[in-house]
Amino acid sequence: MDAEKLWNEFKNKNSIDGDNYSIWAFGDNPNLLLKLVKTGEKTATSSLYKLYNSDEELSKAGEYNIILNSKGQAECITKTTKVYLTKFSDITDAHAYKEGEGDKSLSYWKNIHERFFNECLTSYNEKITSDDLIVCEEFELVYKVN
């Protein structure tokens, strides 16, 4: 479904004013991660802070996200509940579990995200370090296409 159409459907059903939302897809394996969101397994995500543009703001609690599948179609809307920065080395078991991936363990999270972040940093000739800041975002699913 088109993102704007999904947003308008959600707004009308929930009496929401305004258009305070972001549109994005997960960077690695978007359809699998989207499925985890839609089933309630995934309630958090993370990104590498150094990859943000200097004028790019972090998400804020209360903002909405329209999440796209790999074909660019909108499939669900989440509402951000919490955003914080932490070092890669300080990611917690609780955050790894909320990300809902693999066996939900911290070791799985670190392995898969170290690989993914290193791929993102290839063009900069960098590798992730334990001190690199990670943007951790928690959210709740508020609307989905069946």
Question: Language-model segments: what does each one mean?
Answer:
Residues 1-77, 83-146:
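Mixed-charge, low-complexity intrinsically disordered regions
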